[in-house]
């Protein structure tokens, strides 16, 4: 059988935060499928990337005082601990700001334009009058025009999955300032999804039963025809897709339109191809030749919240730019906790991946539990702590791991680690195990790991029944039963090897440890049929896995301590610590305001004539005119910096500085307050 050639991706995480458990679930699902493919001898390239573009990244980077590129790089630096921690083995990890993605995105756009799928239109676009910028979709919120759900984003509804223009929102508001946005005109670029060629292609591609799950196809079908919304209104057909955004924007510039950028959802999926190209470039392989192979299969694992982009826009972009369309879009549901409850850290129902690892919880417990739940459909799966403990302790350890511990010691101690011959009853049992190789591999192919786990656990039950019936611990006590003891224990070890192969895509670390114990190279599915044989030497068994404890689960779901809001006095952080010698360099003196007058041509400054006990006065300008009238200050005592170098200003020479206090946020906390010493202080006195 010819090896398959497969290209696999997961959805790109947005590079503005850490991975959450939904990311980890998807990556484990895809990683398991990739491992199962490789165990059949198939050649797989498994790539990921950070989704690096868009206004949210730009704004977050600005707040952090970083460039968008540095902000994304800092987020990406934290990815490895998650991926390594849960044994998720991508072949490459890139980001959508890579040179490869710039090149591919721009070329795909030009190819679509040449095919007649791009047109420009002057549109009305929301503009934030307070922030003085056009608002990206994700910074506009309002009521969905289709189902009327509240607080939906400006590009798609998370309730009914509709995609629309931001101007379609009802009662929109800026998510940045809360202001009501105003409409301004701008020229935008559209991908003509309503073109009859696109409609014909997408109708066939999504409904032919080959590329998406049946339940996903049924949902997509609604978008092609007339839809009745919950409020009784109707919507019809596919809309053209606005693929451009106005500067300022962090993204890929449209090649023939300076100041215009691709909407993030255009270049994000192209990032799949770009990460693959980056990988192949590193290997010195030809990307174009790889993608041109008609036997190449292309799989995308995604969540059900981004079906629209991956089943309409993405295949149409690829098709009409002359590229290969995806073989399959593999859609999964969300993860809930405790029988459907949404995750919330504050309520103690959040599952933090890093906390899980920090508590010393085995990553393969979670891989196994998710494997036992995921079934290839886009159904939500629930993490129930009691169910988790039962499946790990009773099934994974009690049924599977313990098989080896019940037999390995006898082989090592009584027979020098050498396996023996297997008699007829053992051969019959092993034959039953080998017969399930086809169905289990088929379950992995269908991403129905729940069925693969279920079938494997049923086989574990058969093996444990064999152990209970033959009682090797009693055989070991009986004279003349050495051959039978070696026979039974050899059968158990061979059965354990087969079961380990079946679980290897889900439990790669356990499988590696079992391979070391059995002294065999990493095994493929085909090697289920090839027994170790009499005389094979095995090593000493080491315990493979601890049981999960209630204390670990309690700690995992313990709500975090209430956050104590950091107090920032006056709206500004305290300055870095200085020494007494540093402070002594500043000469602060009591000064009397002999004269105070407004400055002609300035609304902010007052001119102060100060007596600092020097036998002569000083001229000082101070920006306090908004708070004080000249007559209010004349004759008052204040504090001045006496050794500040004179500064030449537009209105004259300033020979010092008067000290005054104000809040950092003058808009929220207006006011400037000149310092005034207690009675008794005299001009010229130094402040220590």
Curated annotation (Swiss-Prot):
Cofactor binding: number and manner: Binds 1 zinc ion per subunit.
'KMSKS' region, short sequence motif: residues: 342-346
Record-listed E.C. numbers: 6.1.1.10
Primary location group: cytoplasm
Biological process (GO), any one: methionyl-tRNA aminoacylation
Entries under Pfam families matching the protein: Anticodon_3, tRNA-synt_1g, tRNA_bind
Subcellular location per the Swiss-Prot or TrEMBL entry: Cytoplasm
Function: Is required not only for elongation of protein synthesis but also for the initiation of all mRNA translation through initiator tRNA(fMet) aminoacylation.
Protein name per the record: Methionine--tRNA ligase
Origin species: Acidovorax ebreus (strain TPSY) (Diaphorobacter sp. (strain TPSY))
Phylogenetic classification of the source organism: Bacteria, Pseudomonadati, Pseudomonadota, Betaproteobacteria, Burkholderiales
């Amino acid at each position: 059988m010819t090896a398959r050639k497969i290209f696999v991706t997961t959805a790109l995480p947005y590079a503005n935060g850490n991975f959450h458990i939904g990311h980890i679930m998807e990556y484990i699902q895809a990683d398991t499928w990739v491992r199962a493919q490789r165990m059949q001898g198939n050649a797989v390239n498994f790539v990921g990337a950070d989704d690096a573009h868009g206004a949210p990244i730009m704004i977050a980077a600005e707040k952090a005082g970083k460039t968008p590129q540095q902000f994304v790089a800092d987020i990406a630096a934290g990815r490895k601990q998650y991926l390594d921690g849960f044994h998720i083995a991508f072949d490459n990890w890139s980001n959508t700001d890579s040179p490869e993605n710039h090149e591919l995105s721009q070329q795909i756009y030009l190819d679509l334009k040449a095919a007649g799928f791009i047109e420009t239109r002057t549109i009305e676009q929301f503009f934030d009058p307070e922030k003085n910028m056009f608002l990206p979709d994700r910074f506009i919120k309002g009521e969905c025009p289709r189902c009327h759900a509240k607080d939906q984003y400006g590009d798609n509804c998370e309730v009914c999955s509709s995609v629309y223009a931001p101007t379609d929102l009802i009662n929109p508001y800026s998510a940045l300032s809360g202001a009501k946005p105003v409409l301004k005109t701008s020229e935008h670029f559209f991908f003509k999804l309503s073109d009859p060629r696109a409609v014909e292609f997408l109708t066939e591609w999504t409904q032919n039963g080959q590329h998406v799950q049946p339940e996903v196809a049924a949902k997509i079908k609604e978008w092609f025809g007339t839809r009745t919304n919950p409020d009784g209104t109707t919507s019809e057909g596919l809309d053209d897709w606005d693929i451009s955004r106005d500067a300022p924007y962090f993204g890929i510039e449209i090649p023939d339109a300076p100041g215009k950028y691709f909407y993030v959802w255009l270049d994000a999926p192209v990032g799949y191809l770009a990460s693959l190209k980056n990988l192949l470039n590193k290997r010195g392989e030809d990307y174009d030749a790889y993608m041109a192979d008609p036997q190449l299969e292309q799989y995308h694992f995604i969540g059900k919240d981004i079906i629209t982009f991956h089943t309409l826009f993405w295949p149409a972009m690829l098709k009409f730019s002359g590229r290969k369309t995806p073989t399959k879009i593999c859609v999964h549901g969300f993860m809930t906790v405790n029988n459907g409850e949404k995750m919330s850290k504050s309520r103690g129902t959040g599952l933090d991946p890093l906390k899980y690892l920090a508590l010393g919880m085995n990553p393969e417990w979670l891989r196994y539990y998710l494997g036992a739940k995921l079934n290839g459909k886009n159904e939500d799966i629930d993490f129930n702590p009691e169910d988790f403990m039962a499946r790990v302790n009773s099934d994974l350890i009690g049924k599977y791991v313990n098989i080896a511990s019940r037999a390995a010691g006898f082989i090592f101690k009584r027979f020098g680690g050498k396996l023996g011959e297997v008699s007829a009853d053992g051969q019959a049992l092993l034959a039953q195990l080998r017969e399930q190789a086809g169905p289990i591999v088929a379950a992995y192919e269908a991403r129905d790991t729940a069925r693969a786990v279920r079938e494997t656990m049923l086989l574990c039950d058969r093996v444990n029944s064999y152990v209970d019936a033959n009682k090797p611990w009693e055989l070991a006590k009986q004279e003349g039963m050495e051959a039978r003891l070696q026979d039974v224990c050899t059968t158990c070890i061979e059965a354990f090897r087969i079961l380990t192969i079946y679980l290897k895509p889900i439990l790669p670390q356990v499988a590696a440890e079992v391979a070391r114990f059995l002294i065999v190279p990493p095994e493929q599915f085909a090697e289920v049929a090839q027994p170790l044989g009499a005389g094979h030497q095995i090593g000493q068994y080491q315990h493979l896995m601890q049981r999960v404890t209630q204390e670990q689960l309690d700690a995992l779901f313990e709500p975090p301590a209430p956050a104590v809001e950091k107090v920032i006095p006056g709206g500004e952080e305290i300055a870095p610590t200085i020494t007494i010698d540093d402070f002594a360099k500043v000469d602060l003196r009591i000064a009397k305001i002999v004269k105070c007058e407004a400055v002609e041509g300035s609304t902010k400054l007052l001119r102060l004539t100060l007596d600092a006990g020097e036998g002569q006065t000083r001229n000082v300008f101070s920006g306090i005119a908004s708070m004080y009238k000249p007559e209010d200050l004349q004759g008052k005592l204040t504090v001045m910096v006496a050794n500040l170098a004179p500064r030449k200003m537009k209105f004259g020479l300033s020979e010092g500085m008067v000290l005054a206090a104000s809040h950092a946020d003058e808009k929220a906390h207006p006011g400037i307050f000149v310092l005034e010493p207690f009675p008794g202080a005299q001009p010229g006195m130094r402040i220590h």
